[in-house]
A protein has these predicted regions:
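Extended, low-complexity cationic-aromatic segments
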Residues: 1-57, 154-155
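A structural preference for long, well-packed, hydrophobic secondary-structure segments
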Residues: 50, 54-66, 86, 93-101, ...
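Short, aromatic/basic amphipathic alpha-helical patches
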Residues: 80-90
């Protein structure tokens, strides 16, 4: 990822190097908790139902606690019955957001912070990108998460 904007003093030209080439896509599957912790998985390429199912089974469910609420948007794999059954067996409640409602999704705020970090990191290889993603995810704090949940209209009881 490259930065989209920059600043310089008046009368100077902004110069930055951005490679030109054909890139493969990288997908980050992640969750966020009020304490700022995440359960993330990074893959090269796009995701589908089988990849999302593996994420839920091996990464997300082990990080969940009974009585947790999992909020998901309307991406097709989020609605597959076997994924919903796995989450129900884990003892969590599943909420689906209305269509086209990123304003209600706190993880969208997290992606904004992650993307800003990744643009600044200027990773130019898969390994460098994976390391940068790990560092970016570790920058998420409990204060960030609480602010994002509050901004999206969620009310919660602090323990």
């Amino acid at each position: 990822m490259t930065r989209l904007y920059g600043r310089v003093f008046g009368g100077q030209r902004l110069v930055d190097a951005a490679p030109h080439g054909h890139w493969c896509s990288t997908t980050i599957l992640s969750s966020i908790r009020l304490d700022g912790s995440t359960a993330a998985m990074v893959i090269e390429g796009a995701t589908d139902a089988s990849v999302f199912q593996a994420y839920v089974h091996h990464i997300l469910i082990p990080s969940l606690r009974p009585q947790d609420i999992v909020v998901m948007d309307n991406l097709a794999p989020h609605k597959y019955p076997n994924i919903l059954q796995m989450l129900e067996r884990a003892g969590v409640e599943v909420w689906h957001l209305p269509p086209y409602s990123p304003d209600f999704n706190p993880i969208e705020k997290m992606w904004s912070k992650i993307k800003t970090y990744l643009r600044k990191a200027k990773a130019r290889s898969s390994n460098a990108l994976f390391r940068a993603i790990g560092r970016a995810l570790r920058t998420i704090t409990a204060a960030d998460a609480a602010g994002w949940f509050q901004h999206c209209g969620y009310r919660y009881i602090q323990s």
